[in-house]
Design a protein with these regions (language model features):
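Structural signature of outer-membrane beta-barrel domains
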Residues: 22-24, 72, 84, 132, ...
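N-terminal periplasmic accessory domains that precede
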Residues: 34, 43-46, 63-66, 78, ...
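Short acidic/polar hinge/loop motifs at secondary-structure boundaries
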Residues: 55, 83-111
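Periplasmic-side early beta-strands and strand-to-turn transitions of outer-membrane beta-barrels
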Residues: 128, 136-138, 144, 155-237
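Hydrophobic, lipid-facing positions within transmembrane beta-strands of outer-membrane proteins
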Residues: 63, 123-125, 139-141, 154-158, ...
Length: 342
């Protein structure tokens, strides 16, 4: 037996921990043309140049943004107000890959759960690409060309804003990007080629009270995107995005201003191991997938700093894996069996 004759207790002092609610390092709102980058191929490639944002690279295109160690669906990603979820079950197409940076004006990055203005979830943070368009008195246009000699990559982009009246406008922009397989110092050419095209049509007007109404349609096409570290590549990935935005600048009840937005995003995606790698006989695989999202949000401003509102989003995903065996297509498994999330 063990006997303890002296027992005493020591009183510890209190420990106080304090932290500021938010600082400037948590929120980044930058004009895209001012971000220090070299021919960013997509939104993820651009984001990695912002302090506190990293990226996962699987090929020449489709870089996946990482904020505070979190990525994919743990980041809420918006393209001009439309919530976007990638359609690939192996994360070949993170949402930011559908943002061609030549066709957007600014990007906002919020690190962590610092705001509820951009929907539920998103513990890693928020990424929001935006276009800002206002009425013009005469046509405005710009044309750009980028080239990268290593992979033979080039991007051609254009933007034009036309006045329809003193208060209405039409904006058209688009781009086309192509790249081959770059060559390493050892003479190896990894499968990193890609081909993308996209365009956007924006129709907007200022109302008599100064409020703004805008309709957007965006189309993004990705073809033959190689991923050397994965078992398959993107054969195609086609996206249609629709948004309607209304900003009321005059008081309405207790609100000094209102923002109302509706959006719909449809993505059809096919990955296989034959389009870029050639026929593989009985080992050929193909996986068609889709990701469709719709929703909206209403936000009212009260006073100078308070906001109140509501938002809704609905996402449906489908994915099935198939193989070719003995010359016949054989269904293997459902990866996303009509999965719904709200």
């Amino acid at each position: 037996a063990i006997l303890i004759s002296n027992v005493s207790a020591e009183e510890l002092t209190d420990i106080q921990i304090s932290s500021p609610i938010m600082d400037k390092a948590t929120i980044s709102n930058e004009a895209i043309e001012e971000i220090d980058t070299r021919n960013a191929v997509d939104g993820g490639d651009l984001l990695k140049n912002i302090n506190g944002v990293n990226a996962i690279r699987r090929g020449g295109h489709g870089l996946e943004a990482v904020i505070r160690g979190q990525s994919d669906a743990r980041l809420n990603t918006f393209l001009d107000g439309a919530m976007v979820y990638g359609a690939c079950s192996t994360k070949m197409d993170p949402a930011s890959t559908y943002a061609n940076v030549n066709n957007y004006d600014s990007v906002t990055v919020i690190k962590g759960t610092q705001s509820v203005l951009f929907g539920a979830g998103g513990p890693g943070g928020i990424v929001s690409f935006k276009r800002v368009t206002n009425p013009v008195t005469k046509p405005e246009y710009s044309i750009g060309q980028n080239f990268d000699s290593n992979a033979g990559a080039y991007t051609t982009s254009g933007n034009i804003v036309l006045p329809l009246s003193s208060s209405s406008y039409l904006r058209l922009n688009g781009s086309s990007s192509n790249a081959g397989n770059y060559e390493t110092g050892a003479g190896i050419k990894p499968l990193t080629e890609y081909s993308t095209t996209d365009y956007t049509v924006i129709l907007g007007t200022l109302l008599s009270d100064g409020s703004k109404l805008e309709f957007n349609y965006s189309n993004n096409r990705q073809d033959k995107v190689g991923y050397p570290g994965l078992r398959m590549d993107i054969a195609y990935s086609y996206t249609d995005m629709y948004t309607m935005k209304y900003h009321k600048v005059t008081p309405f009840g207790i609100f000094s201003s209102l923002n109302f937005e509706l959006f719909n995003t449809d993505i059809d995606h096919l990955m296989d191991n034959t389009t870029l790698r050639g026929t593989t006989g009985n080992g050929s695989m193909f996986t068609p997938t889709s990701s469709d999202t719709y929703g909206g949000r209403l936000i009212g401003k009260i006073g100078s700093s308070m906001r109140a509102g509501l938002d809704y989003e609905h996402n449906t995903k489908n994915a099935e894996q198939n193989m070719t065996m003995m010359g016949s297509n054989v269904f293997m498994a459902y990866l996303w069996p009509d999965v719904e999330a709200e």
